[in-house]
């Protein structure tokens, strides 16, 4: 019985994922950053209170985690950057 409860609980946890992505500036572009810069955390939390952020080094752009599902983030297939 305990194993059955454990399996059901495991399946429920697998489906729990938070949205992540690059926040956009006013011009629709990704927000540039430098490594070890706190601007990303500040930018992410200014838009979405419960989120966190860091500078993603390969692209040198801010990246936000723990976003709500309706959060608008930069999307490669729909680039709106006017920069």
Curated annotation (Swiss-Prot):
GO annotation, biological process: defense response
Please report the stretch or stretches of sequence annotated as the LCN-type CS-alpha/beta domain.
19-82
Q: Which Gene3D superfamilies match?
A: Knottin, scorpion toxin-like (3.30.30.10)
Pfam families per the UniProt record, alphabetical: Toxin_3 (PF00537)
Q: Which residues cross the membrane?
A: none
GO MF, one term, reads: toxin activity
Question: What is the tissue localization of expression for this protein?
Answer: Expressed by the venom gland.
Kindly indicate whether the keyword Signal belongs to this entry.
Answer: yes
> What task does this protein carry out?
Beta toxins bind voltage-independently at site-4 of sodium channels (Nav) and shift the voltage of activation toward more negative potentials thereby affecting sodium channel activation and promoting spontaneous and repetitive firing.
Report what the protein is called.
Putative beta-neurotoxin RjAa17f
């Amino acid at each position: 019985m305990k194993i059955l409860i454990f399996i059901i609980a495991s399946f429920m946890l697998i489906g729990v994922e938070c949205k992540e992505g690059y926040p956009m500036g006013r011009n629709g572009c990704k927000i540039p950053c430098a490594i070890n810069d706190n601007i990303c955390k500040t930018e992410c939390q200014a838009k979405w209170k419960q989120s966190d952020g860091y500078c993603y080094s390969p692209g040198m752009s801010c990246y936000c985690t723990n976003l709500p599902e309706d959060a608008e983030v930069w999307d490669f297939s729909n680039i709106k950057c006017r920069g």
